[in-house]
Swiss-Prot record:
<feature type="modified residue" description="Phosphoserine">
    <location>
        <position position="351"/>
    </location>
</feature>
<protein>
    <recommendedName>
        <fullName>Dynein axonemal assembly factor 8</fullName>
    </recommendedName>
</protein>
<keyword id="KW-0597">Phosphoprotein</keyword>
<dbReference type="GO" id="GO:0005737">
    <property type="term" value="C:cytoplasm"/>
</dbReference>
<dbReference type="GO" id="GO:0036158">
    <property type="term" value="P:outer dynein arm assembly"/>
</dbReference>
<feature type="modified residue" description="Phosphoserine">
    <location>
        <position position="161"/>
    </location>
</feature>
<comment type="function">
    <text>In cyliated cells, dynein axonemal particle-specific protein required for deployment of ODA to the axoneme. Interacts with outer dynein arm (ODA) subunits.</text>
</comment>
<dbReference type="Pfam" id="PF15773">
    <property type="entry name" value="DAAP1"/>
</dbReference>
<feature type="region of interest" description="Disordered">
    <location>
        <begin position="388"/>
        <end position="520"/>
    </location>
</feature>
<dbReference type="GO" id="GO:0120293">
    <property type="term" value="C:dynein axonemal particle"/>
</dbReference>
<keyword id="KW-0963">Cytoplasm</keyword>
<feature type="region of interest" description="Disordered">
    <location>
        <begin position="93"/>
        <end position="202"/>
    </location>
</feature>
<dbReference type="GO" id="GO:0070840">
    <property type="term" value="F:dynein complex binding"/>
</dbReference>
<feature type="region of interest" description="Disordered">
    <location>
        <begin position="217"/>
        <end position="256"/>
    </location>
</feature>
<feature type="compositionally biased region" description="Basic and acidic residues">
    <location>
        <begin position="111"/>
        <end position="125"/>
    </location>
</feature>
<feature type="compositionally biased region" description="Acidic residues">
    <location>
        <begin position="401"/>
        <end position="410"/>
    </location>
</feature>
<feature type="region of interest" description="Disordered">
    <location>
        <begin position="328"/>
        <end position="366"/>
    </location>
</feature>
Length: 520
């Protein structure tokens, strides 16, 4: 190649002879880097392996020539002198084609062609090798990837040449010299410019389609690999698009596919529970279809404290009504004279004050009987002290009846002490049964004294002492219940509180609540 160039040197003149030296060095340096048809072309990439462009460094795909332009600003002057020397050797003006009028680099090759034809070179020689040049250009057009990968090294090696390194004409000239060193690229200048523009457009399109789509495929690759052919269809279309040189149509369908797949991967139960929990904490309604679950939870959360508050209000109301009802629960029989009621009013008030807190069992049982289906039974388990002034107040009303009342109280206390061991066996009874037993015993005790009074023929005069005795019996029975409860609590081990509703057996209770008729 060097010998042929030396042989052509006398006929070409000084400019062309000085130009071939650097091109020879460039071809030697780039010869090992140029790919062949079976090494890097797309014909060998149709297999299962990935495209070779994706294995390169992306920074070398588009070389940055700004540094070379800044370092060699004087190459433009050399090119101008070079073109001027070529013009001086021309005997007549040269007609430049319309396509090459906008490119100053092509003007150099055209005028050099005319100079060689005028000096006696064979004009048909370039046309003989034009088939090889077009074949090489077609090969360069088919695999544009090696041109992108090795463009940095080409531009770096052209740095020492006399021509401008950023001249795009150097690429086509280099490809022509590679096919045949003797063939000159001057005859195919117009075809080279068209091919060069096509190469640039294809390179830009390939960068936009392959590189950018590679980034999106890498992003959607881990998610689409799990799902089968539905998710592989967009990526397969993206790979086949650069091969067929057709623009992509399906990238807008990528985000909906990804969003649907991400929605399928979610656990909707956990999301609903978390949204409901967030609404309970923040007090805001959950958006969308979750509002019914959140409202259901809010209703449940409201029902629990509202029911609790309502129950506590009912308990407080019951306590207040018990304290009020204990004052007016017991009434005197209808056939009792008015003077007897006034005489016994003091003892009744004293017994109510002392026994209103100690014995709410019968009054509560009467109140619960009025409410037929009451769900709760309240029993007062507080320990109460035995009043000391009960017997003096109760016996201070009449001097004639004081001895009888004391005897009845002593008998009632003795009966209660005798029945207290047997009452411990009734601990297994429920509170309601105990209250019913007390109420039944109390009603029997109040009904027995009225029977002799109704049988007597002497109505008015004989009725007054008996009614008085009946009223005293009711008052004494209430005091006996209080005393019996206190004596039973005193006998419990370790001071354990005991419900006031614990009563002895029916026989013992009847004996304790009903004194003998001889004492009346």
């Amino acid at each position: 190649m060097a010998s042929n160039d030396k042989g052509m040197a006398p006929s070409l003149g000084s400019p062309w002879a000085s130009q071939m030296g650097p091109w020879d060095a460039i071809l030697k340096a780039v010869k090992d880097q140029l790919p062949s048809l079976d090494s890097d072309s797309p014909l060998s990439d149709y297999g299962e392996e990935e495209l070779f462009i994706f294995q390169r460094n992306q920074t070398s795909l588009i070389p940055d020539l700004s540094e070379e332009l800044a370092e060699d600003p004087a190459d433009g002057d050399k090119s101008r002198a070079w073109v001027a020397a070529a013009e001086e050797s021309l005997p007549e003006p040269v007609l430049v084609p319309a396509e090459l009028a906008t490119e100053p680099g092509c003007r150099q090759n055209t005028r050099t062609k005319d100079a060689s034809s005028q000096e006696g070179r064979d004009p048909g020689r370039p046309f003989e090798s034009s088939g090889e040049v077009s074949a090489l250009l077609g090969m360069a057009e088919e695999p544009p990837r090696w041109l992108e990968g090795d463009l940095g090294s080409l531009s770096f090696n052209t740095k020492g040449s006399q021509g401008p390194p950023w001249d795009p004409q150097a690429e086509a000239t280099l490809s022509c010299h590679e096919g045949d060193p003797k063939a000159e690229p001057l005859s195919t200048a117009s075809q080279e410019s068209v091919n060069r523009r096509a190469l640039r457009q294809e390179r830009r399109k390939m960068i936009e389609t392959d590189i950018l789509q590679k980034v999106t495929r890498d992003a959607c690759g881990p998610t689409s690999s799990d799902k089968g052919g539905v998710k592989e269809a967009p990526c397969h279309a993206a790979e086949s698009a650069p091969r067929s040189k057709m623009p992509l149509v399906e990238p807008p369908e990528g985000p909906p596919v990804l969003s649907l797949q991400q929605l399928e991967a979610w656990d909707l139960d956990d999301i609903l529970q978390s949204l409901a929990g967030q609404e309970d904490n923040q007090g805001n309604r959950a958006p969308g279809t979750v509002w019914w679950a959140a409202d259901h939870r809010q209703v449940q959360d409201r029902m629990v404290p509202s029911a609790h508050n309502r129950l506590m209000e009912q308990l407080a109301l019951l306590c207040t009504t018990q304290s009020k009802a204990s004052a007016c629960a017991r009434k005197v029989p209808a056939d009792t004279p008015q003077d007897t009621k006034e005489a016994d009013s003091g003892s009744r008030c004293a017994s109510r004050k002392q026994g209103s807190q100690a014995g709410p069992g019968p009054q509560l049982a009467q109140g619960m009987r009025l409410n037929a289906e009451s769900p709760t039974i309240f029993i007062d388990l507080r320990q109460m002290e035995l009043p000391d002034h009960l017997s003096p107040e109760s016996s201070s009303h009449s001097s004639s009846d004081s001895e009888e009342e004391e005897e009845e109280e002593m008998a009632a206390l003795g009966d209660a002490e005798g029945a207290s061991p047997s009452s411990l066996g009734l601990r297994t009874c429920t509170g309601k049964s105990q209250l019913l037993q007390q109420l039944r015993a109390f009603q029997k005790g109040t009904a027995q004294p009225e029977l002799p009074a109704s049988k007597g023929p002497a109505g008015g005069r004989a009725q007054a002492p008996e009614d008085t005795a009946g009223s005293r019996t009711g008052r004494k029975q209430h005091m006996k219940l209080c005393a019996k409860g206190q004596s039973a609590q005193a006998r419990l081990p370790r001071g354990r509180p005991r419900a006031l509703g614990d009563v002895p057996e029916p026989g013992a209770a009847r004996e304790a609540l009903m004194p003998p008729l001889e004492q009346l």
